[in-house]
């Protein structure tokens, strides 16, 4: 299965539209959103074209393709408007023999690990910085941010397909790869 993985839309209609265009272009079967879907939070500037109602409409239109975990900016009020679940703290995916623990990153992260077995993968957003770090017992992956990238990183997403991870800018240009 081909997964598109993205994080931190933060209510930007512009970047949500760009992400969904990339999702269609990539022909991925599922889109995993790692939280912070609608609200920008008090620590971030407003993203371009901040319009949460438009983001709701766009994402509800592809609800059957979405898997989402809760970010620190996501609330029960957001869930009342969205037609797909967003309040799970984590999701578990399997890629071959490896388990992927997908979460937002504000609770569990490199500094505070969830219960992982040797060889598992910790996947989270939250920092807005794309990463791929091989630790002794686990692999840490971050797709970066769709709308508010940090540390001079591009507006980005991640593709997971057949054991290969490819980080891409929203225009589809690959800039980092890793094979599991």
Language model: regions and residue ranges:
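Internal catalytic-core helix/loop-beta-alpha segment
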Residues: 83-131
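Alpha-helix C-terminal capping segments
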Residues: 59-62, 80-81, 113-118, 160
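Core catalytic region of metal-dependent phosphoesterases/phosphodiesterases
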Residues: 2-95
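Active-site environment of divalent metal-dependent phosphoester hydrolases
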Residues: 10-14, 39-41, 72-79, 107-113, ...
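Hydrophobic/aromatic beta-strand patches that form the interior of the parallel beta-sheet core
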Residues: 32, 67-69, 121-123, 139-141, ...
